[in-house]
Amino acid sequence: MFSPDQENHPSKAPVKYGELIVLGYNGSLPNGDRGRRKSRFALFKRPKANGVKPSTVHIACTPQAAKAISNKDQHSISYTLSRAQTVVVEYTHDSNTDMFQIGRSTESPIDFVVTDTVPGSQSNSDTQSVQSTISRFACRIICERNPPFTARIYAAGFDSSKNIFLGEKAAKWKTSDGQMDGLTTNGVLVMHPRNGFTEDSKPGIWREISVCGNVFSLRETRSAQQRGKMVEIETNQLQDGSLIDLCGATLLWRTAEGLSHTPTVKHLEALRQEINAARPQCPVGFNTLAFPSMKRKDVVDEKQPWVYLNCGHVHGYHNWGNKEERDGKDRECPMCRSVGPYVPLWLGCEAGFYVDAGPPTHAFSPCGHVCSEKTTAYWSQIPLPHGTHTFHAACPFCAHQLAGEQGYIRLIFQGPLD
């Protein structure tokens, strides 16, 4: 979980606030992680604070005056109320916080570039033709530089001119204390799990976060003009396992503390080798099955285990029970005669998605990603935003919508006959 430098010199390790992991990727982007575009992003304490906090409010601005203020070499948020009036809130440097920005833009203010997740996509080209719904400057996370290093999330990010513009059509309003606030077009949704991110976790309620970090119930649809009700007892403070939805991609927030209890990639590799050492066999061909190495996680191997999703019986690939008159991938299991999809099994390699370090005994349906029982049980009950107003459970390793009664199955391996 840690870079070699950190393992060798723990005293020199910079403070890690946490990590953001994009749901739908199994350890890296399909074509590999490059620069600021990757499947996970670690937030470390910066050498020098770059956080900002609100200061002066300019209320009755003409568009020209608003432009003059926002052209200053400091951060500002502009709320356009009408063609004649704009409220500009200036932001000043905050030496106690670090700011990290997330969005689709590749411009320099964005620390973590996020593109739309296409379920099961094998290459970045699969995602390019889709019209993106992720904002170019989607959100910002502000981390306290001093213990306990609290992280808070806010909708919208500052652009290259250090501005955030909320146009006439954006939902915005004046708060009871005379300040301004607003929502971005497609919104930033957050869900904090109950009982943290552990094997006892339960899903929380999805909320929308405003530009100023206030918490609201969801709008009727993603981009509706009318905001939801303010939820005053909840905050924008991220906790281990919080989910952040940017309308096109969902991110999992893991704290440094939470990650220290997560299985390492080495541990997952040891579990893989343990399964393979037991020499599971195909009940039809009697050939030994083996999960391919984590590096080869998207090319079907000849020894790869396959599973009948209706019953969980694990086989090697064979043509038994493959009747042409059946639609699609449905096959009859030779062991119990149940008919259903027959798919290859893949190990879940993204350790940050695991809620425990249990053995890989269960698989998500219909994709065949394998992980611990508690991890499949957890993700199968999490409703993830899909489109503009629907929610469904999905596999965290590939973003495929889960199917079947539970969304996952217990795997039944046959050991060697000798």
UniProtKB/Swiss-Prot annotation:
The lineage of its organism: Eukaryota, Metazoa, Chordata, Craniata, Vertebrata. Its EC number is 2.3.2.27. Residues 311-399 are annotated as: Ring-like domain. Changing S121A: Decreased phosphorylation by ATM in response to DNA damage. E3 ubiquitin ligase catalyzing the covalent attachment of ubiquitin moieties onto substrate proteins. Involved in the TLR and IL-1 signaling pathways via interaction with the complex containing IRAK kinases and TRAF6. Acts as a positive regulator of inflammatory response in microglia through activation of NF-kappa-B and MAP kinase. Mediates 'Lys-63'-linked polyubiquitination of IRAK1 allowing subsequent NF-kappa-B activation. Conjugates 'Lys-63'-linked ubiquitin chains to the adapter protein ASC/PYCARD, which in turn is crucial for NLRP3 inflammasome activation. It comes from the Eukaryota. Residues 13-200 form the FHA domain. Expressed at high levels in normal skin but decreased in keratinocytes from toxic epidermal necrolysis (TEN) patients (at protein level). Keywords: Chromosome, DNA damage, DNA repair, Phosphoprotein, Transferase, Ubl conjugation, Ubl conjugation pathway. GO terms for cellular component: cytoplasm; cytosol; nucleus; site of double-strand break. The modification Phosphothreonine is found at T127. It comes from Homo sapiens (Human). Pathway: Protein modification; protein ubiquitination. Changing H313A: Loss of ability to ubiquitinate RIPK3 and NBN. No loss of interaction with RIPK3. It is found in: Chromosome. Belongs to the pellino family. Interacts with MAP3K7. Upon IL1B treatment, forms a complex with TRAF6, IRAK1, IRAK4 and MYD88; this complex recruits MAP3K7/TAK1, TAB1 and TAB2 to mediate NF-kappa-B activation. Direct binding of SMAD6 to PELI1 prevents the complex formation and hence negatively regulates IL1R-TLR signaling and eventually NF-kappa-B-mediated gene expression. Interacts (via atypical FHA domain) with RIPK3; preferentially binds to the 'Thr-182' phosphorylated form of RIPK3. Interacts with RIPK1 and IRAK1. This is E3 ubiquitin-protein ligase pellino homolog 1. PANTHER family: E3 UBIQUITIN-PROTEIN LIGASE PELLINO HOMOLOG 1 (PTHR12098:SF4), E3 UBIQUITIN-PROTEIN LIGASE PELLINO-RELATED (PTHR12098). GO terms for biological process: DNA repair; negative regulation of necroptotic process; negative regulation of T cell proliferation; negative regulation of TORC1 signaling; positive regulation of B cell proliferation; positive regulation of canonical NF-kappaB signal transduction; positive regulation of cytokine production; positive regulation of double-strand break repair via homologous recombination. InterPro entries: Pellino_fam, Pellino_FHA, Pellino_RING. One of its GO terms (molecular function) is ubiquitin-ubiquitin ligase activity. Phosphorylation by IRAK1 and IRAK4 enhances its E3 ligase activity. Phosphorylated by ATM in response to DNA damage, promoting localization to DNA double-strand breaks (DSBs) and ability to mediate 'Lys-63'-linked ubiquitination of NBN. It catalyses: S-ubiquitinyl-[E2 ubiquitin-conjugating enzyme]-L-cysteine + [acceptor protein]-L-lysine = [E2 ubiquitin-conjugating enzyme]-L-cysteine + N(6)-ubiquitinyl-[acceptor protein]-L-lysine. The modification Phosphoserine is found at S121.
